[in-house]
Amino acid sequence: MADNLPSDFDVIVIGTGLPESIIAAACSRSGQRVLHVDSRSYYGGNWASFSFSGLLSWLKEYQENSDVVTENSMWQEQILENEEAILLSSKDKTIQHVEVFCYASQDLHKDVEEAGALQKNPASVMSAQATEAAEAAEAAEATEAAEAAEAAEAACLPTAEESLSTRSCELPAEQSQCMGPESSPQVNDAEVGEKETQSDAKSSTEQSSEILPKVQDNTETPKRNVITYSQIIKEGRRFNIDLVSKLLYSRGLLIDLLIKSNVSRYAEFKNITRILAFREGTVEQVPCSRADVFNSKQLTMVEKRMLMKFLTFCVEYEDHPDEYKAYEETTFSEYLKTQKLTPNLQYFVLHSIAMTSETTSSTVDGLKATKKFLQCLGRYGNTPFLFPLYGQGELPQCFCRMCAVFGGIYCLRHSVQCLVVDKESRKCKAIVDQFGQRIISKHFVIEDSYLSENTCSGVQYRQISRAVLITDGSVLKPDSDQQVSILTVPAEESGSFAVRVIELCSSTMTCMKGTYLVHLTCMSSKTAREDLERVVQKLFTPYTEIEAENEQVEKPRILWALYFNMRDSSDISRDCYNDLPSNVYVCSGPDCNLGNDNAVQQAEIVFQKICPNEDFCPAPPNPEDIILDGDSSQQEVSESSVIPETNSETPKESTVLGDSEEPSE
């Protein structure tokens, strides 16, 4: 592939995260020649989404990447006397402290694999076959009981008697099988046909009926469906699991950019239907719109009037500085106590509407956050938030598609060894890729995870604690099983942080029917499990075979859990990096905020440095007005081959973005 790459571009972008993808799209749209490369085999970097087996493959790849160091000196041949090289990192060190737990019933057989899964590459298949042969020989020498114990131990899975806090799986390289069957390949969801999907769904239903005859036969007292690990594996393509958990404010920068650039045509969205609060050990729904407030049975009539009066003030708070001037130096929590709000209302406003810290957020910060929340109400639904169908990882791919439409060239699994810098001008002139090809460019955009330790020696990073859970029920029993909810659990002690919980149902196209996908996020003070486990234990209970028959279980049950820490470089300025040329622009990974404003802001700043005075991602011209110069077939092939088309299984209730201000429901 390297031999076919042109050797001269205007902009080279390394990494396919959201900021880099927006920059690539904007530059390509403005007429720049763009090369967009990524050493990974998937789009999105730490913004990516995976099917279940894809996530297991990512975990295994992460472990192998942390253990193996590859050295390649081909770049040295491309460096001239008046040049020097800035080496890039071949190891992604942005993910740490990975721990996996599986609580679903362990009925897994070796021949169970993800429905519609693609074959591995030949080398992987041969390796898997050799491993299976070795395991078969071992299995022949052991009893069935020994096999079961051995499998559970090898998989680092807790038994039914062990609680969530008693068993950990810090992934070792030799125990990668703990994450699923060895036959689970990496999956490209869009390359599987619709017929396969339908037949696989049918076979999955038949398998479920064989496993659970009692559930279907018991018509008098129906019980919860028992979801097994085999079912999760087989329905793995139904999952789209985000590495980063975010929502889109309906009037946020990203929504505005999607509409302005017409990139919104590549994606569809679903409204967040519920804002929840966790107070005194219980989960309850928070009324936030005018209609919700007056229809609420939780609030008294006096509380409804008090809340509406305060929310009306928050929308116009900048016009009434005298109302809060005396409290600018105090926390928002203290300010709320002066506003004649009941403790119940104070809690709702602080943790579920403003979503700010009780101890660190100032009055102005709280008022600003509340105003933003209220201004986003009603544009597309009764809450301020939207979620992209198939996960957050769709968004970088949408912008990559736009870049490709305007001539951008894409290469995944294509690593860059070094940047080539002119000693006199201190400008970057070129890159040298894994094949030793030297590619010249005027501007270079790079995701910060590619920078080496030498370049980042003076940088102190923050960390984000993340947890991903697959559960069998909602944290608050819904009127409909298709609710999408956000919940903030306040910090309990000094030094800890509030935890944001986003619960996704199957209509978001992120999990199989009968399950929920739950994301937990907070700023790190310890490892992810240490930070988040207290909240997990409050809201959920680990699945056990005994409890599977018990209809009295109040909390939803965890079927599978993943914890990890992700690096947050959003607050790092370029001055912190050592000797970066002025035409090299660094993009950070995801931050801990709920929205995507930081990614859009940094993308626009970088674009204006590359293309000053150019419009940032303007709408594409009407296809009927385009006059093609020469054969356009090559461009059409490029567009169709770069990013998979939108999945045909889009639910009817999804939201299509547009300029209309009317709610879509």
Swiss-Prot record:
Q: Name the predominant localization.
A: cytoplasm
Q: Per UniProt, what is one Pfam family of this protein?
A: GDI
Q: Which residue ranges have biased composition labelled Low complexity?
A: 632-642
Region entry Disordered: which residue ranges?
167-219, 620-665
GO terms under biological process: blood vessel development; intracellular protein transport; protein geranylgeranylation; protein targeting to membrane; small GTPase-mediated signal transduction
Q: Could you give one GO CC term from the UniProt record?
A: cytosol
Localisation: Cytoplasm, Cytosol
Going by the UniProt record, its keywords in alphabetical order are: Cytoplasm, GTPase activation
Write out the similarity annotation.
Belongs to the Rab GDI family.
Query: What is this protein's record name?
Result: Rab proteins geranylgeranyltransferase component A 1
Question: Gene that codes for this?
Answer: Chm
